[in-house]
Amino acid sequence: IILRREEKGSMEKRVQLSVILTNAPGELAKLCDVLRAANINILAMSIQNAKDSVKELYNMREKTGRRIALAESYRGILKDSSDYSLIRLLVDRPAEAEKTLLKANHLVDTEPILVFRLVNQPGMLGKVVKRFGEARVNIDYVYGSAMEDAKESIFVLHVAEADLARIENSLRDLS
């Protein structure tokens, strides 16, 4: 999908890999080596300590009063989760990457994401995500990057699977 002129960019639906790694020195290097050996290129990556996700769950439990587990269980999970990181990967060949990582005994999950290539100038991401708000589509998380002198930036956005078709149609109407 080519975005309208003022949004200056394109969007495509891709597949993201999520991998749980032990949070220890050298583990990310091992993951990268596994992918390199299969000639799989990492295009974008986000790393988050799993403890943050568990903290969010615990905080939501406190706010809503909905108790899925006992407080002691959450504290135990929180303690254990600091030993792990959640790695989100955009790669050039996701199906092959998934097989390769599973073969190397990694826990892997796949899910659809939206990848935006935008002109690297102030306000471009804001113009695009404004369309999500107008379409009443919540963005769960974003990661991306560009260097100051790069012509393009890349951003990975995750939305609920139920919202993918709606936002694709909304953006397609803009081209």
Task: Give the positions of each predicted feature.
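A conserved regulatory-domain signal marking ACT and ACT-like small-molecule sensing domains
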Residues: 3, 7-175
